[in-house]
């Protein structure tokens, strides 16, 4: 990737009309102009990736592991650079980018590098034959990324992919592509050419070309439900496997016997960490009617203290939305909430620095008097907005949670362990939390159900998504292999 402001990378189009701007969301200033790829340059990338795959799949597991550990070391050398770049193009807090996003890259490369030779195989002895089940790589794969966690998604897709012997082409989120591109450049100082590549793009052109390419054998996307469905439709034409992580409308449920202070703390983090631009954001608070007023009083006071601002500055709690369009989307939902009859019970503070007057800021917002049928309680807003609804019983809470289109997470706060465990089994989500909302999921399955998608990331089962099973069978020599009776009659053993 060029260090100049105008970035033309290896697989950029020759067409200058493919240029697109990347902004600093804290100031609105253009920080880079990137030349997107197109179907032609995507094909070139696929051809390079396919050639690399034919050699990479033969690299011994121990060597593959060594290279992945080396990748982790190289990324760590650039940790501060990556964190600052991430905040500059995405808007998240520098401390969060450093502690969470960038650290995850090295962690996930070491994790999957250490698992390469530990994926359990299967051996079946049926008496007359031995059957061994092993895993084979798909080939060239595609990884389509969103804008909210560029390092996490770049590593979360590329690490298990190449660990299993595949090669991958990354399509970064167009709103914040620079960090993903830089990470791939760093990885390529270690890996053979073509193992991990990126093709930038705007809109559906590059993802469609990637998904429909006959040499691309598997695609994983993290993004909107609309984008995910488009990938599934294109992949189905070639009967191509996909992995989908498409968002959530997650609930944090508080019962009367809960520790209200703990619940309020976790609800504050769940709603406003990463400025609410997280598929795991707990944007729906379900508060039992008996404690609703007490909880809201405590929670609203904290929301009012939240300071929106530049993620590079100390004292900032909530960064800007990633783009002006995302800001307008969130503000539209705030207007919709008021029109639907909900009440803005609390809002955080907007920045007053002149440098940030053109930034994409939205005041952190808490809605009360929310009915479960309202759009703000049903749709994924993807911004610093949280709704607080009342419920009266466990059954009602379960019904509200399961009424959402998505099913990613649910957090339950109660002193009654039996109730909490029972609810965990009843809610239609992929991940549940009892009296905590700690979302570092490396090592356990990350993913959901319903319109959240399918497949699991960040765990040993992820390696199965990035590979396919193969059966190897041979006679055991211990007993005759069964055969069709007419064969014994027409071609008897000599």
From Swiss-Prot:
NAD(+) binds at residues 223-228. InterPro entries: Ald_DH/histidinol_DH, Ald_DH_C, Ald_DH_CS_CYS, Ald_DH_CS_GLU, Ald_DH_N, Aldehyde_DH_dom. Pfam families: Aldedh. Pathway: Mycotoxin biosynthesis. SUPFAM superfamilies: ALDH-like (SSF53720). It catalyses: an aldehyde + NAD(+) + H2O = a carboxylate + NADH + 2 H(+). Gene3D superfamilies: Aldehyde Dehydrogenase, Chain A, domain 1, Aldehyde Dehydrogenase, Chain A, domain 2. Its EC number is 1.2.1.3. Keywords: NAD, Oxidoreductase, Virulence. One of its GO terms (molecular function) is aldehyde dehydrogenase (NAD+) activity. The active site is at residues 245, 279. It comes from the Eukaryota. The keyword NAD applies. The keyword Oxidoreductase applies. Aldehyde dehydrogenase; part of the gene cluster that mediates the biosynthesis of the selective antifungal agent ascochitine, an o-quinone methide that plays a possible protective role against other microbial competitors in nature and is considered to be important for pathogenicity of legume-associated Didymella species. The pathway probably begins with the synthesis of a keto-aldehyde intermediate by the ascochitine non-reducing polyketide synthase pksAC from successive condensations of 4 malonyl-CoA units, presumably with a simple acetyl-CoA starter unit. Belongs to the aldehyde dehydrogenase family. This is Aldehyde dehydrogenase. It comes from Didymella fabae.
């Amino acid at each position: 990737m060029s260090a100049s402001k105008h970035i033309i990378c290896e697989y950029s189009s020759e067409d200058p009309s493919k240029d697109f701007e990347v902004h600093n969301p804290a100031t609105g200033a253009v920080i880079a102009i990137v030349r997107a790829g197109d179907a032609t340059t995507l094909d070139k990338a696929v051809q390079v990736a396919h050639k690399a795959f034919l050699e990479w799949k033969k690299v011994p597991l121990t060597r593959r592991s060594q290279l992945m550990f080396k990748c982790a070391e190289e990324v760590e050398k650039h940790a501060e650079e990556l964190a600052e770049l991430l905040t500059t193009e995405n808007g998240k807090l520098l401390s969060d980018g450093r502690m969470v996003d960038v650290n995850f890259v090295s962690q996930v490369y070491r994790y999957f590098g250490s698992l390469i030779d530990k994926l359990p195989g299967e051996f079946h002895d049926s008496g007359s034959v031995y059957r061994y089940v092993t895993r084979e790589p798909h080939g060239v794969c595609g990884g389509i990324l969103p804008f909210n966690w560029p390092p996490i998604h770049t590593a979360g897709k590329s690490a298990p992919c190449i660990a299993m012997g595949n090669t991958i082409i990354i399509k970064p989120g167009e709103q914040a592509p620079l960090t993903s591109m830089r990470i791939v450049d760093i990885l390529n100082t270690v890996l053979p050419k073509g193992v991990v590549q990126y093709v930038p793009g705007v809109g559906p052109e590059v993802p469609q070309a990637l998904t429909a390419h006959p040499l691309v054998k598997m695609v994983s996307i993290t993004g909107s439900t609309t984008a995910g469905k488009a990938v599934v439709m294109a992949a189905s034409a070639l009967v191509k496997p996909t992995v989908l992580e498409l968002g959530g409308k997650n609930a944090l449920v508080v019962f009367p016997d809960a520790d209200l202070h703990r619940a309020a703390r976790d609800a504050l983090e769940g709603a406003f960490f990463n400025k609410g631009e997280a598929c795991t954001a707990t944007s729906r608070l379900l508060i039992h009617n008996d404690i609703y007023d007490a909880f809201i009083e405590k929670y609203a006071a904290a929301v009012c203290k939240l300071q929106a601002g530049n993620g590079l500055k100390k004292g900032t709690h909530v960064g800007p939305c990633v783009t002006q369009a995302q800001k307008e989307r969130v503000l539209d939902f705030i207007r919709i909430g008021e029109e639907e009859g909900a009440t803005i019970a609390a809002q955080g503070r907007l920045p007053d620095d002149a440098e940030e007057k053109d930034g994409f800021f939205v005041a952190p917002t808490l809605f009360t008097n929310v009915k479960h049928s309202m759009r703000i309680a049903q749709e994924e807003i993807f911004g610093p907005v949280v709704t607080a609804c009342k419920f009266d019983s466990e059954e009602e809470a379960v019904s509200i949670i399961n009424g959402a289109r998505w099913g990613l997470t649910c957090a339950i706060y109660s002193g009654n362990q039996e109730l909490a465990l029972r609810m965990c089994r009843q809610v239609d989500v992929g991940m549940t939390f009892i009296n905590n909302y700690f979302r570092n999921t490396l090592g356990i399955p990350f993913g959901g159900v319903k319109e959240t998608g399918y497949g699991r990331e960040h765990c040993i089962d992820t390696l199965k998504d990035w590979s396919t099973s193969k059966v190897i069978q041979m006679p055991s020599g211990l007993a005759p292999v069964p055969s069709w009776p007419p064969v014994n009659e027409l071609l008897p053993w000599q």
